Amino acid sequence: MSMILKISAESGFLYVVATGEFSLEEAKRTFIEMLEAVARNKLGKVLFDGRRLVGNPKFMERYYYGKFAGQTVAESTVRGVSPSTQFAYVLNVPMRDPERLGEKVALSRGMRVKVFDDLDSALGWLQVAPVNHLDAGDGT
């Protein structure tokens, strides 16, 4: 099963809902898809809701995803993605790593990213207002 993104441009941010089964290759593919939407919509904030993703990424997969994401954002400025774009990821365990390895690796490459366990905290960090139709993402 592949990862599927539902992307919508909201007032001031891009809202991305991801479903399916995690794999490193699929995560890289969908990250590029998300960056293309950022450039197309000229938005500087992304709310990535991955609470419906399934899988348990291995240590090195977390590292390689963080490295890929950080480098890809840095290299995407020529495609219209600002290096100051903020990315808030909302994930459940085991997709969300308590050690935040992927987040730390991406941060070390200049990406503005933070991982959360709830939507409200992510919206607060992005400093954007909630939108009524934002899905709970956790099946509730």
For the regions a protein language model found, what residue spans apply to each?
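Amphipathic, Lys/Arg-enriched alpha-helical "gate/interface" segment within cytosolic domains
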Residues: 2-140
